[in-house]
Amino acid sequence: MSAIQRLTGKTAVITGGATGIGFAAAKRFIEEGAFVFIFGRRQEKLDAATAALGPNSRAVQGSVTELADLDRLYEAVKAERGSLDIVMANAGAGMATPLGKITGEQCDIVFGTNLKGTIFTIQGALPLMAQAGGGSIILTGSSSGTTGAPPLSVYGASKAAIRNLARSWAGTLRDEGIRINVLSPASIATEIAKEALGEQGMKMFAQQNPLKRMGQPEEVGAVAAFLASSDSSFMTASEVSVDGGLAQI
């Protein structure tokens, strides 16, 4: 349990919130006093997450690529809480494919989830954030959006676009009392990363950053809580990297 209670009374939505970084952020937000709605595609993962998160969590099943699902999410938030203070647009998709083998379907999936999904996640949240008098938006980026990675070019391009969304929207959202920032992780030991890389792959991947280790989802969740809170009140349109220094070398 966090001793800091920076989010008491706040309501948050986290897409991709049932596992990995999203779940770690949800756990930290609740520890700091927030009520959290997690949103994701797999009902069994959502059920397990809410069982672990406790009574200050709710789950809504759906995909950020389906506008009707996002409508249901925000209807649930409105019905139970009335307004919304924090949105973490964390749902994402990525595929490792070298140039020359990229398909249209892969582009549609990655950009549909990472870019279109983020746009409509935020757009749908704005009326409820206006009811709260403003708040904080966190977009999950990636260090690959800055550094580039040959097998992840489509994914990296989609995350570079996320950074541009924050910069493009910051002035407009200021007038609504809303701050927007990008949280860009890399080298994080999520379950998906462990399954994809294996134990040996994780060890090799860890050596690519200056700290020579993999980060933990909880370390990203702690930074998300900072960005969600008033401690980051003079930050907007910023990108914060939680990647062991990977994007800086």
Curated annotation (Swiss-Prot):
Gene3D superfamilies: NAD(P)-binding Rossmann-like Domain. Its EC number is 1.1.1.-. PROSITE patterns: ADH_SHORT. Induction: Expression is significantly up-regulated under xenovulene A producing condition. One of its GO terms (molecular function) is oxidoreductase activity. Pfam families: adh_short_C2. NADP(+) binds at residues 21, 45, 90, 155, 159, 188, 190. The active site is at residues 155, 159. Disruption phenotype: Does not affect the production of xenovulene A. CDD domains: SDR_c. The keyword Nucleotide-binding does not apply. The keyword Ribonucleoprotein does not apply. Keywords: NADP, Oxidoreductase. It is an enzyme of class 1 (oxidoreductase). Xenovulene A is a natural product exhibiting little structural resemblance with classical benzodiazepines yet is able to displace high-affinity ligand binding to the benzodiazepine site of the gamma-aminobutyrate A (GABAA) receptor and could be potentially used as an anti-depressant with reduced addictive properties. It comes from the Eukaryota. Oxidoreductase; part of the gene cluster that mediates the biosynthesis of xenovulene A, an unusual meroterpenoid that has potent inhibitory effects on the human gamma-aminobutyrate A (GABAA) benzodiazepine receptor. The first step of xenovulene A biosynthesis is the biosynthesis of 3-methylorcinaldehyde performed by the non-reducing polyketide synthase aspks1. The salicylate hydroxylase asL1 then catalyzes the oxidative dearomatization of 3-methylorcinaldehyde to yield a dearomatized hydroxycyclohexadione. Belongs to the short-chain dehydrogenases/reductases (SDR) family. This is Oxidoreductase asL5. It comes from Sarocladium schorii. The gene is asL5.
